[in-house]
Regions:
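Amphipathic alpha-helical repeat scaffolds of TPR domains
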Residues: 7-89, 114-135, 163-186, 212-246, ...
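Solenoid-like repeat scaffolds
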Residues: 66-70, 107-114, 156-165, 201-208, ...
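Histidine/acidic-rich helix-loop-helix segments that form or flank divalent-metal centers
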Residues: 167, 219, 223, 450-474, ...
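Divalent metal-dependent phosphate-bond-processing catalytic cores, especially two-metal-ion Mg2+/Mn2+ enzymes
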Residues: 163, 201-213, 236-241, 245, ...
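Short amphipathic alpha-helical segments
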Residues: 425-433, 511, 524, 528
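Acidic/His-rich, divalent-metal-binding segments that scaffold phosphate/diphosphate chemistry
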Residues: 372-501
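Helix-turn-helix repeat elements of alpha-solenoid scaffolds
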Residues: 10-19, 33-62, 86-108, 136-157, ...
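Non-transmembrane, amphipathic alpha-helical segments
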Residues: 136, 298-301, 322-326, 350-354, ...
Length: 562
């Protein structure tokens, strides 16, 4: 293959990805039934024809790249590297394909002296592994950390390195090590603090000073990320990461004391501007969390400040995205503020009825944001992860009156946003209710002993309860797919082995999600078991025995319907 063929392949592929985004966006536009169905048919037809086209294209292109010695000249290899970085920087990209490209280039450049090319490869591998680690923690989290660390140690020779792209990569690696990798747990607080000290050394070095005029973006980014860790270190140390996978980080008392001192000094010197900026929401929420944890302010005081700020700035929020091309900041604004508001709301002393009223208000804010969100910004995976944190924040469940309200909340946030997942869950639910209705009418003895029913007459007496349980279980059976929907809904090309491995983790992921609340925990076994064989001797996950579950009957029903 020559460089022009490679360039054209990836240019065509980007066109396909853009079209996929447009079709997905069309499914979210409010319209009448006929218009919506027409959009659904157009989407299905595109995937049907494009899958065949891309499958043929992939089979003609990828095997050549995957050979031990691909038949590519220097220009072709250079174009492959350029295409990889174009994908890396694009709003729309394909993580699995990006990872495959990086692996191919890694074999080619691995033993060369081309530092810029190899750093591009390492940066891409770090990024793709980091994103996959948000779905399946290991082995991707450790790989991401190791690739970022490999890049960051290049800072020791910062002055001798002439390539601007390598300088940029060093700063990006540092930022992800002290923030993303720390949040995900692959970097300890002690390690993050030591890496931050390295960042400050680089920030004050003559080597960086010499590049501040010629490469202003490098110094500016390092300044931003060094300061960001200063504001977020306390929250990281206190494990404010409240997803269902949050884990206790042991931080030595002397380090915790040092972090608290640095944070207090920072906020004492901070001069907040009168006009709220796009960055102020991070500062305000972080300071409130710090003040509350250290006894400086009450939950009521912190909630009031964030609530007032949010109401004042919300009308201007879209300007943040217009000013900053990283429209991802709009997601961060909404999710950071709403997460903090709900967190403090639970802890306030206000009457429960008032808490529930504000919580309903915040739920509507979330729904309005999702409805207005421009899917063409290319950050839907980031939005999925943010919504996941809000949907599965355990303390919030104290503000619901019924189990049905909890299920509706989850369904709206992490299922109904995605058309195929939404339709699939509804169809499984309809099938399950139909099958169970027939069983109750014709063979009720099959259900004797299930959920404590003692006779066919008892089955009939509990008909409504059984059907409601099946309905809810079906709606939630695939909830573990939320963070991997971009993979699952990849219908324009064959999936890679990497992607299949990630998809197979969704039953356990769903079980983790549903374990956060007593009402939701009733559905854990169904989420975990719906891909197991009836006899328990096949399917996945391997660490779950569906034959020993008290929900075995319902697991089998949902499996058939699925």
């Amino acid at each position: 293959m020559n460089s022009e063929q490679i360039r054209k392949f990836f240019a065509d592929y980007q066109v396909v990805l853009k079209r996929v985004e447009q079709l997905e966006a069309a499914m979210r536009i409010k319209s009448d039934w006929d218009t919506w169905c027409a959009a659904l048919r157009e989407r299905a037809e595109f995937f049907r024809t494009e899958y065949a086209h891309m499958n043929a294209l992939m089979r003609s292109v990828m095997p050549e790249f995957a050979k031990d010695e691909p038949d590519l000249d220097d220009d072709a290899w250079k174009q492959l590297q350029i295409s990889m970085m174009d994908f890396y920087r694009a709003d729309t990209h394909d993580l699995a394909l990006l990872m495959e490209l990086a692996k191919i280039l890694q074999k080619h450049y691995g033993h060369s002296n081309n530092l810029a090319a190899m750093t591009d490869v390492d940066l891409t591998l770090a990024y793709t592994n980091l994103e996959f680690s948000r779905i399946l923690r290991e082995p991707y989290g450790t790989r991401a950390r190791d690739y970022y660390r490999k890049i960051s140690v290049l800072s020791r020779n910062f002055g001798a390195i002439k390539e601007h792209s390598v300088h940029q990569a060093i700063v990006v690696a540092y930022a992800n090590l002290v923030m993303s990798c720390c949040v995900l747990g692959t970097v300890t607080m002690e390690e993050a603090f030591a890496i931050w000290e390295e960042m400050k050394e680089l920030q004050a070095s003559d080597a960086l000073a010499a590049t501040r005029e010629s490469e202003p973006d490098v110094g500016r980014l390092l300044d931003i990320f060094t300061e960001r860790f200063r504001t977020d270190a306390y929250a990281l140390a206190k494990s404010f990461d409240r997803t269902m996978e949050a884990h206790t980080r042991f931080v030595p008392p002397e380090l915790m004391s040092r972090i608290e001192q640095i944070t207090a000094e920072y906020y004492e010197k901070l001069d907040k501007p009168e006009e709220s900026t796009a960055d102020m929401f991070q500062i305000i929420t972080s300071q409130c969390e710090f003040d509350y944890e250290t006894g400086r302010r009450t939950a009521d005081e912190c909630w009031k400040e964030i609530h007032t700020f949010f109401r004042k700035t919300k009308p201007k929020v879209k300007q943040f995205g217009e000013v900053d091309v990283r429209k991802i900041d709009v997601i961060s604004y909404y999710m950071t503020c709403l997460d903090a508001l709900i967190s403090f709301l639970v802890e306030t002393t206000m009457p429960m009825e008032d808490k529930k009223r504000y919580f309903r208000e915040y739920q509507q804010d979330i729904r309005n944001f999702i409805a207005d969100y421009d899917t063409r910004t290319g950050h839907s995976n980031t939005l999925n992860n943010a919504l996941e944190e809000l949907a599965f924040f355990p303390n919030a469940y104290a503000l619901f009156d019924t189990a049905e309200e909890k299920i509706d909340y989850i369904f709206r946030l992490v299922v109904a946003r995605h058309c195929t997942a939404f339709l699939h869950s509804l169809m499984v639910s309809a099938f399950a209710e139909a099958i169970l209705s027939a069983i109750i009418d014709k063979e009720p003895t099959l259900m004797v002993g299930y959920h404590g029913v003692t006779s066919p007459e008892d089955v009939q007496a509990h008909r409504a309860e059984i059907l409601q349980f099946a309905h809810d279980a079906a709606l939630l059976h695939d909830v573990g797919k939320n963070s991997m929907l971009e993979i699952i809904e990849t219908q324009h090309r064959p999936l890679t082995d990497e992607e299949f491995g990630i998809i197979r983790s969704h039953p356990n992921r769903g079980g983790q999600y549903l374990s956060i609340d007593e009402d939701l925990a009733r559905y854990v076994d169904i989420a975990r078991g719906h891909h197991k064989f009836y006899n328990g001797k096949g399917g996945y996950p391997n660490d779950f025995d569906n034959t020993a579950s008290p929900e075995r009957f319902m697991i089998d029903i949902i499996t058939v319907c699925d």
